[in-house]
UniProtKB/Swiss-Prot annotation:
Gene designation: deb-1
SUPFAM superfamilies cross-referenced by the UniProt entry: alpha-catenin/vinculin-like (SSF47220)
Quaternary structure, from the entry: May interact with sorb-1.
Regions of compositional bias (Polar residues) in chain numbering: 817-830
Membrane topology: Peripheral membrane protein
Protein name: Vinculin
Amino acid sequence: MPVFHTKTIENILEPVAQQLHYVLAMAEKNATSVDEVRHLGTSMPNLDRFASRSALALSRASSRRSIPEYITPDTVRHVVNDDDCPVCQLMMPRGKDGCVSRLVILHEEANDGNAMPDLTGPVGMVSRAVGNLIQVGYDTCDHSDDRILQQDMPPALQRVEGSSKLLEESSYSLKHDPYSVPARKKLIDGARGILQGTSALLLCFDESEVRKIIRVCRKANDYVAVSEVIESMADLQQFVKDISPVLHDVTNDVNLRQQELTHQVHREILIRCMDSIKVIAPILICSMKTSIELGTPHPRQGHAEAIANRNFMSQRMTEEMNEIIRVLQLTTYDEDEWDADNVTVMRKALSAAKSLLTAALDWLADPHARSGAVGEKAIRRICEYADRISARALPEDAQSIKRSIFEITSFTDELCNLRNNGQPDRENLAAQTARRLKDLVGSQNSSGLMGDALQNAQRHGGANPAHTAAGRLEQALRWLDNPGLDDGGLGLQALRLLTADARKLADRLNPQDRNRLLGLCSDIDRLAAQLADLERRGLGNSPEAHQIRNQLKNALRDLGDFMRRVLTDRVVDDFADITTPLKQFVEAVHADPYDPNREQNFVDKSQRLTDHSQSMTTTARLVASCGPSKSKKTVEAILDTAEKVEQLTPQLVNAGRVRLHNPGSEQHFENIHKQYADALHRLRSHVDDAIDTGEFVRASETAMRRYTNHCEGAINGADAHGLVNNSSQIARLGNRVLMTAQNEADNSEEPSFVSRVRNAADQLHNAIPPMVNNAKQIAQNPHDQYAAQNWRGTNDHLLNSVRAVGDAITGVPMSNGRHSSYQESISRASPYNPPPPSSQVIRSVNASPPTAPIIHNKMIIREDIPAPPRPPPPVELSPPPRPPPPPEYDEEEETRAFWERYPLPQASHQPMLAAAHNLHNELKQWSSQENDIVAAAKRMAILMARLSQLVRGEGGTKKDLINCSKAIADSSEEVTRLAVQLARLCTDIKMRTALLQVSERIPTIATQLKVLSTVKATMLGSANVIGPYGQPVEGSEEDDEAMQQLVHNAQNLMQSVKDVVRAAEAASIKIRTNSGLRLRWLRKPMWSNF
């Protein structure tokens, strides 16, 4: 039962909401007279005038700015509250209790209680308001050309009408028998039916609006598919004339849609796809023009490369449009769902295959269609998508899909041969292929093999290993910390994937680091195998198993620290210079036509560019999978950009070859060159976001010292070329550090931090040119010792400036290079807490200067301060009697005791309780003392566990269920308020934005939770519910539907709160020093949870 919040239909729903409020008012006034009821009726606005004003509320023009909102789905952007949403007001209007929720409680409390008053007057007004709603709905159906809307909307309208009749029947029954229990139940069922029917009505309308946008997108896809068969300039002009207005409509419609979505991820995907389309469209047209010019009147050198560029851009445009179509149809966003997830990849592939099915069937149905046409390519691409699904499906599904792919490919090859030779299709190959395609992709009557594989993969479910090394390390440590917990092998699988990633990283390292990393992996695998063997034999809690667990924990932490260090080194080396290979390639492309080595130089520079791109994309993927970042957004951005760089590299080489032999195609080459350069810079930026800035600066300093040693060797050997290369690398690394410092300063609003970093950056900026100039002087005269000494002095100053930048960014001076930085990161993760300062008063101290402060775990400790003299013994006095201690309330102890009574269930049996446990496991590492965010989040986890009990009918009443959901909403409001307050005081712009984005969804989800809980309360204990046409039906199906939506909403809420806590903990280290905000993040020792 999705609940929507739309401006479009607000005027239609408002009368229904208002009239149901008056029904409630009359239900609560047992002594109300008929005159008072009539008085209430006369105070209402004129419903007929209201209906006429709302008659066109469902028009396309108005609805485009008022897309509805779902319970679990993507929603309009504004935060939902009780005052703005008429549907919410049906459940939770202004006042102590909501309309339907209050009726539920009245029904529950009225066993043999007070009599109900005469409700025929207000119920009659409800009927008239519902009648206006139904009239507008039917008018919308009559004027729409959407057959699905015309099919789905009438049952929803009939359901609302049937529920309204139930209200009328209940009011007449209560008029004759004020104590009638069945009449009271009809009253509740009628109100609930109106709500559910109205929600179904709005769902139909919103899906119709989405289909309108999708139709425009598919029309654009049809035009793009034609681009591969255009062979004349006249056809190209007509193509541009036809596709331009379609792309304009797509841009406008998608832009209006994304503005009203609440999910930041969905908005960003739509914006990114539209930006890509705006960039690709002119490049596609230019590549089409180039391919036509090089192919007319006969193909010239570079024609094949131009066609490859055109086809690539056409495919890119199609993929971006398919991604828009996919996101437009999304109704939920699961924060735990990664783009590399098998289910997500399968869903994308199925959506893309369905979009190609019509073109494929049209080609098969046309006996005169040529081989190589758009339809045949559609069949080939469907097979590619099917193969992608089979690679991720269950074994039995994969086998069926592969068999179908083989049959379709064989039939298509035979059919192409027949048509190329002009022979008829006597064996009905086209019909057989069409039937196989429908069986594979699905049709109106069947889900198809690909759809079945997707459903089975979703049903197989279970938790998947994390997608980053940090996440897998966390899963493995959680498995080791909970020996009695059956995680289905998740922890062991995460551990093995972690070591597999480490071995991939080892291939990129020098022999010394490679051997150490491989040795760590071998030790971990050996210990894991021993532990798994002990658990299989039932000895998982033996002393030997505990000893192995401790060894594994230490080895895993060492592995994580070592991977982070060597990965940062790889980023420093591979991304130090991203422009030189590209610059040299461009120079090779523009070489003099009469240069005899022109072709060979182009091949060499192309190979160097390809190798450099492969090195960067490989390192970037390792950063995404093995790096310290847990941010889904950052990791996905790295993977997406790395794939684009990898795809664009051969296209840039093709465009360069075209330009090499055809100087007139300069614009075509510049278009792809610019796109490739932009992708490179984006990739470097995303990689920089994924690694620690302080670690990067320290690693850069170490690399610069290594190149300094190479320069010393070049000076001693009078190697001018080696000196120039190594000193240039030092300068490049210095510029990288300078760019990083400038980014850090731009991202902060803390005046002292910005000033400190900018001063260090200015010092570094001034130190680079002297070092480079002195290196040039040595290169001109390698035996000039005076110039060598000058170079050493300027280079030392440069290295000191780099260290000063690292000190300014981290806030901690490093005396021993980068080693201290890693020691600091280790100490931050340790549970050690320094003892509180002594309460004794220091009366006298011998005069001695204090020593330099010692840096330890970000605390400054002064040593060698003599202890104060021992005070005299106290005089014996008779102290007054000690008052009795006040009763203490230990919230942490109460929380621990609560979760001991609620053990972790199987997620498939009690998913709401499992979601509450998931949040609790995230929060139990933090103390709630002096941290209101953690305290409120812990209350939410406990309340959600209680709500799980209530919705399963395990004790409590309907009133308890409704009140519990309201308490959860109140706690979520507190979490959001505190998170927004913290975000306003955060000086880090990126952290502040991330915190605001993850917290903006909580109020909407919490409001929806109250609505769903009320709907669930109306179904508890009910044998029957109201069917689509007002008839009573068995309630199992609708009750299951309501329960599933409530479960999904609860899971989203718990996940959102967990994300807010993580973002708040990260943002807390960057709050304004003069804010006065007190928010302690005190990590609890593990033993305190037992």
